[in-house]
Amino acid sequence: MANTPSAKKAVRKIERRTEVNRSRRSRVRTYLRKLEDALTAGDATAATAAFQAAEPEIMRAVTKGVLHKNTASRKVSRLAARVKKLSAA
């Protein structure tokens, strides 16, 4: 339990930031889910469109500090490879 006024304020700030980060993370997951659905359905055009929507959202999460840069790069790279493979098939 926070005792000092500054510690109590820090707790309040952390709660607000946690809520914002939770919503950002949820937003990224939603885009990834849509892309995953398009990939499993085998729809190349939908997968490409979903990837083009998801990629900036993932990178935005990096800018906002929700995801680590390398994690996001790895996700984008693997998703791009899957979309490319589906489009080629």
Curated annotation (Swiss-Prot):
It comes from the Bacteria. InterPro entries: Ribosomal_bS20, Ribosomal_bS20_sf. GO terms for biological process: translation. Transmembrane segments: none annotated. The keyword GTP-binding does not apply. It holds the Pfam family Ribosomal_S20p. GO terms for molecular function: small ribosomal subunit rRNA binding; structural constituent of ribosome. GO terms for cellular component: cytosol; small ribosomal subunit. SUPFAM superfamilies: Ribosomal protein S20 (SSF46992). Keywords: Ribonucleoprotein, Ribosomal protein, RNA-binding, rRNA-binding. Binds directly to 16S ribosomal RNA. Belongs to the bacterial ribosomal protein bS20 family. This is Small ribosomal subunit protein bS20. It comes from Xanthobacter autotrophicus (strain ATCC BAA-1158 / Py2). The gene is rpsT.
